[in-house]
């Protein structure tokens, strides 16, 4: 996984910087996501494994993508095909989105709660997190009844466990030590 991230990072960064320069970040995100979906297709997977010459593979891949990608994105795909890197397209698309969020000073926060939160509670969480992280926060909520009560918030490296299950677990660890 770390190797794929390392391979994908320069492609994502180059694409993002170009998209930013061209003021086309959204369209590039869409093109990369589409190309990533094509690369994950079960019919395309065997071709990406290296059984096809890079020039032919690039031509085939671009043909499948059709008009969904522009000339500059086609150039990126050609370079990736020449280097045998089309298989990392999903990671490139994911890192592109991360760069996009970082640039926009946005962060995605996972909120896991024991019960469904009200809109007022979600608003309060959003405001608090935005203040603490100095970024715009997008909340993704889910319910896990095993928490008993409370919430677990994960935003980037930050993890706040305010659940009863977490408190019981920490208390148990303290008593055992």
UniProtKB/Swiss-Prot annotation:
NCBIfam families: ATP_synt_delta (TIGR01145), PRK05758.2-2 (NF004402), PRK05758.2-5 (NF004404). This is ATP synthase subunit delta. GO terms for cellular component: plasma membrane; proton-transporting ATP synthase complex. HAMAP family: ATP_synth_delta_bact. F-type ATPases have 2 components, F(1) - the catalytic core - and F(0) - the membrane proton channel. F(1) has five subunits: alpha(3), beta(3), gamma(1), delta(1), epsilon(1). F(0) has three main subunits: a(1), b(2) and c(10-14). The alpha and beta chains form an alternating ring which encloses part of the gamma chain. F(1) is attached to F(0) by a central stalk formed by the gamma and epsilon chains, while a peripheral stalk is formed by the delta and b chains. Pfam families: OSCP (PF00213). Disulfide bonds: none annotated. Belongs to the ATPase delta chain family. F(1)F(0) ATP synthase produces ATP from ADP in the presence of a proton or sodium gradient. F-type ATPases consist of two structural domains, F(1) containing the extramembraneous catalytic core and F(0) containing the membrane proton channel, linked together by a central stalk and a peripheral stalk. During catalysis, ATP synthesis in the catalytic domain of F(1) is coupled via a rotary mechanism of the central stalk subunits to proton translocation. This protein is part of the stalk that links CF(0) to CF(1). It either transmits conformational changes from CF(0) to CF(1) or is implicated in proton conduction. It is a peripheral membrane protein. One of its GO terms (molecular function) is proton-transporting ATP synthase activity, rotational mechanism. Keywords: ATP synthesis, Cell inner membrane, Cell membrane, CF(1), Hydrogen ion transport, Ion transport, Membrane, Transport. It comes from the Bacteria. Its main location: membrane. It is found in: Cell inner membrane. The gene is atpH. InterPro entries: ATP_synth_OSCP/delta_N_sf, ATPase_OSCP/dsu.
């Amino acid at each position: 996984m770390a190797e794929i991230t390392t391979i994908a990072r320069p492609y994502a960064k180059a694409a993002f910087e170009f998209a930013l320069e061209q003021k086309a970040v959204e369209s590039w995100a869409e093109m990369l996501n589409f190309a990533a979906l094509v690369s994950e297709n079960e019919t395309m997977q065997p071709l990406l494994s290296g059984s096809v010459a890079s020039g032919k593979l690039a031509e085939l891949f671009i043909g499948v993508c059709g008009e969904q990608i522009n000339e500059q994105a086609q150039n990126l795909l050609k370079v990736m095909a020449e280097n045998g890197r089309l298989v990392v397209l999903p990671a490139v698309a994911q890192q592109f989105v991360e760069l996009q969020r970082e640039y926009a000073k946005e962060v995605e926060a996972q909120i896991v709660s024991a019960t469904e939160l009200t809109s007022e509670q979600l608003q309060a969480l959003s405001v608090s997190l935005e203040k603490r992280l100095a970024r715009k926060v997008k909340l993704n909520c889910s319910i896990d009844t095993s928490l008993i009560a409370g919430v677990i918030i994960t935003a980037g490296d930050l993890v706040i466990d305010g659940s009863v299950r977490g408190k019981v677990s920490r208390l148990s660890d303290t008593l055992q030590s």
